[in-house]
Amino acid sequence: MTIPVGEKKLRLAERMSRLGTESAFEVLVRARELEARGKEVIHLEIGEPDFPTAPHIIEAAAQALRDGWTHYGPPAGLPQLREAIAEDAGRRRAIRVDPAEVVVTPGGRPIMFFTILALVNQGDEVLYPNPGFPIYESMIRFVNGQAVPYALREDRDFDVDVEEVLGKLTDCTRLIILNSPHNPTGGVMSRASIAALAEALADRDIFVLSDEIYSRLIYEGEHVSITQFPGMKERTIILDGFSKTFAMTGWRLGYGIMRPDLAGQVARLMTNSNSCTASFTQIAGVAALRGDQSCVDQIREEFRRRRSVIVEGLNRIPGFHCPLPHGAFYVFPNIAGTKRSSRALADSLLNEAGVACLSGTAFGAWGEGFLRFSYANSVENIQKALERIEAWARRNL
């Protein structure tokens, strides 16, 4: 793979040709370019809570800086944060978590990457959801693994079809990636589906990466983790963090929970890459988990209100059908009635209506026929976006 640089060419490692990207940031760049030219754009493309971080968390970080928490820390994370995570995660999932099973990382993505680096050899198969978070496939391909998608379908409320997943297992299957609540659909895996999958995997040497970053943003029912079922905790890596729950995306604070011997290997990868996670942000993480939780409740209830507004609004627009998502802060409307491809419609809404959203195909080929909107924006802006989309649809459809 070569890239022109002046009169010379940069010769990159072949693996770089296998590295993907995340379309949300590409759309954000295009939207910013339109704004720079004077066009008003409503941003419903980025999955980032628009709330400020709670004051007690900010103050904990500020005090940590004043107290000198500005130096290297342990690669696996500060003991006090690992203890707080173990207590919180164990209580919320009704499982026992030891601090030795926790690795703290700068954001949740290193847990995805390090899990795949540590477990997947060339040619090993990894099952992942499609549509799904695009970085899953990117990381699988980067390490020369075989990316094997399983479908999430609207007629199943975007729950996992366990029979389909089991039908894709082979002797080469090393890892299954689950994501619930799910990005981009907002779907939530049912207890029955998780239980059936756990039972089927009981006698197989297969790990599960369970991406539970939205686990506290569920609007009906409760979060269920596959680690709650017999025999699964020791073969599951939980990915979680602070970005979505506590509106701390820019703090870069995530963690993984896994068996201690694997945690030691992931900590080695931290040593060889990031060294450690910033200490003062970890002190803030302790305050987030052990302090007042009303900020989380307020964020969830505001998202619930916005969800109602955007679902009702989209269902009034010709050509759109929007099911009610049960978690996260995304809607994934079916746009087959518009007779437009997902990419073409997303481009038109950005360029002509001034509404930034993502094509369903940004999350895999099986996202065709859908768009993803993030309702991590004010009700006022969501309503304005809906008015623009409806006006565009009535002019063009």
Give short role names for the model-derived ranges.
Residues 72-105:
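Conserved N-terminal alpha-helix of the aminotransferase class I/II PLP-enzyme fold
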Residues 2-12, 20-22, 27, 33-40, ...:
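PLP-dependent class I/II
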Residues 16:
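Substrate/cofactor-recognition hotspot
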